[in-house]
């Protein structure tokens, strides 16, 4: 019974919680030449866990009340696989070696004690003792495994993008405040594939860096989603010295390419917004939209940016008239003025306007 419980736990732990981490590990070790299968990989790990337990159980003679300790090497294997191998450090290695040494010493002491005191144990106490020991082991394995939210979000999003599940990819980590440069790039790709980059980009946590929405091609060895997928989607590859904006501006200036790849426009405009360069954004957006059209309705974040721009500039290059957006901006300003402390204001405003470009412009960080 204990064996079935631990094997079921091992499968769920690997398949549900750590499969993306193992996929990344296999990708790195094979230099991208093999692909990880979640079901097959999980079954192989469970089989190895079972073999380790069976071997330990066969060569050890522990008292009945301590039988669950035969699962300790298997638990240690799971912890090492999902923590040490995936995220190596000397400190972690020393800790696991110490646990291994303590396990051997504990076995020697327990075995000697058992040989000198052999008596029948109550079946109920034996069962309870083993269940408690096994539960503690499973909890410890869960605590030891890689629990870096950022890394798990990135890997899960990469897997979903490889499977062309763009709507699911967008939702990864959506309710968390965790963000990174890579997460921002991956989510932008998923949103663009769904036609929502200008509409929803700033509804999620974003990290703005020099690369903006483009992942350097050299990062391919550390990703299961190849950066070239983004460049193929845009229809061109950047030069070694060009910045993300220079690259996007260049390809947006090619009429035929822009016509066949309209997503270039959104990448360019969103890049300007991520850099908080409203003047650049205003000069670029005029190339793509006819502002003489009174019925023009822009994607949400573009409209928010232009309303903000018109309030920050005495002579704006372009104006956008949208009553609803204008009203929302005034409410945003009035609400912000209620708080004097910047940190308190940022947190309070996030609760009501965290899904707007305005919040990012005033409180989001732009990394150099």
Locate each region found by the language model.
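Solvent-exposed soluble domains appended to multi-pass membrane proteins
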Residues: 234-368
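Membrane-interfacial, low-structure loops and terminal tails that flank and connect transmembrane helices
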Residues: 27-30, 61-64, 112-125
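Membrane-embedded alpha-helical segments of integral membrane proteins
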Residues: 64-118
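Aromatic-anchored segments of alpha-helical transmembrane domains
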Residues: 9-14, 72-83, 136-141
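Soluble catalytic regions of membrane-associated enzymes that act on cell-envelope
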Residues: 146-283
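Hydrophobic membrane-targeting alpha-helices
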Residues: 51, 55, 59, 106-114, ...
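Internal/C-terminal transmembrane anchor helices
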Residues: 122-148
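Membrane-anchoring hydrophobic segments
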Residues: 1-72
């Amino acid at each position: 019974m204990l064996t079935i419980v631990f094997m079921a736990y091992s499968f769920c732990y690997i398949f549900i919680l750590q499969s993306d981490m193992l996929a990344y590990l296999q990708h790195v070790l094979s230099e991208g030449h093999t692909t990880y299968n979640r079901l097959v990989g999980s079954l192989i790990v469970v089989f190895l866990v079972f073999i380790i337990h069976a071997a330990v159980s066969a060569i050890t003679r522990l008292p009945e009340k301590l039988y669950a300790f035969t699962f300790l090497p298997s638990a240690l294997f799971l912890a090492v696989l999902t923590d040490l191998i995936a995220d190596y450090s000397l400190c972690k290695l020393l800790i696991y070696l110490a646990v291994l040494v303590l396990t051997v010493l504990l076995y020697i002491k327990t075995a000697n004690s058992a040989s000198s005191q052999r008596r029948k144990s109550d079946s109920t106490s034996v069962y309870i003792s083993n269940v408690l020991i096994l539960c503690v082991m499973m909890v410890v394995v869960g605590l030891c495994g890689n629990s870096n939210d950022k890394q798990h979000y990135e890997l899960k999003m990469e897997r979903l993008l490889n499977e062309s599940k763009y709507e699911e990819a967008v939702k990864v980590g959506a309710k968390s405040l965790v963000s990174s440069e890579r997460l921002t790039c991956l989510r932008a790709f998923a949103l663009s594939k769904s036609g929502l980059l200008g509409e929803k980009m700033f509804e999620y946590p974003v990290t703005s860096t020099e690369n903006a929405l483009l992942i350097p091609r050299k990062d391919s060895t550390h990703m299961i989603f190849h950066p070239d997928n983004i460049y193929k989607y845009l229809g061109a590859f950047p030069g070694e010295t060009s910045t993300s904006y220079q690259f996007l501006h260049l390809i947006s200036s090619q009429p035929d390419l822009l016509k066949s790849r309209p997503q270039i426009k959104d990448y360019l405009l969103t890049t300007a917004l991520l850099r908080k360069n409203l003047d650049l954004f205003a000069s670029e957006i005029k190339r793509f939209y006819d502002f003489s059209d009174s019925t023009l309705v822009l994607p949400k974040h573009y409209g928010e940016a232009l309303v903000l721009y018109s309030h920050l500039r005495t002579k704006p290059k372009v104006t956008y008239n949208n009553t609803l957006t204008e009203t929302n901006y005034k409410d945003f300003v009035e609400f912000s003025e209620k708080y004097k402390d910047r940190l308190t204001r940022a947190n309070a405003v996030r609760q009501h306007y965290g899904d707007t470009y305005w919040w990012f412009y005033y409180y989001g960080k732009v990394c150099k």
